[in-house]
């Protein structure tokens, strides 16, 4: 049987590989230099590959445990929405990654939305801890 991920756009396939393996070193090759990252816990968009990679690396550590999984996806020509669920300290987190990519298949937009409020609060705490290391 064919792997359904093989039919996904290259940027989304690569993101799935990173999310699944936790290989944060692969972010540099995947992110566009002018990528914009929008976090559910930071008011302003974060612009540029270095800062986006920092936030995404922390998110992979915080969210990417054994409980993390994508449960649905909607894919368009240059963007996708990936719904995920995970568990942190007994709190169920439900979120959506909205990802855009350029003609070179580099991610140029990454927005994370999370619910419920308890999830945002624990995510804020854990991200602050991860970013301070």
Locate predicted features.
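Compositionally biased, intrinsically disordered low-complexity segments
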Residues: 15, 44-45, 117
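A beta-strand edge to alpha-helix "cap/lid" segment located at domain peripheries
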Residues: 2-3, 57-133
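Secondary-structure boundary/capping motif
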Residues: 9, 32, 49, 53, ...
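Short N-terminal micro-motifs specific to bacterial/archaeal maturation
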Residues: 2, 18, 42-43, 98
